[in-house]
């Protein structure tokens, strides 16, 4: 339940691993369905919507999966002592576990850590027509140029979408 909540929250919000690990109960306004966090990387505050899917995943974890602990962090270790999660590597291990379970083959040199979920969110937002300033704000970037790095074009994906003009329109007569 914890891993599911972590992955869903990351996919829906684009939070950095450090911000997911440090998320506290007081950071979530359940009535407004929002989160207010101070970003670990930049120290800047960011307000984000909390989707129903992510919210229910967190609630399910809190009610049915989280060990009893005095920690104010949402996500805690499940082995004793039940304190805050460790490093970003711990978060990457969560994702890696499910990549392997799903039988997904990651090519040598490909990056697939938790940070890749931020890029996926940014790309999906762009594809759905979300404006760059909104994507920038969602990712907690100060400079839109930082966001643009997340939106690099996937040449292989474009090649798969390309049409063969000869196939579509017949041989061109010159």
Predicted segments, located by residue:
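Conserved catalytic core of the tyrosine transesterase superfamily
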Residues: 1-174
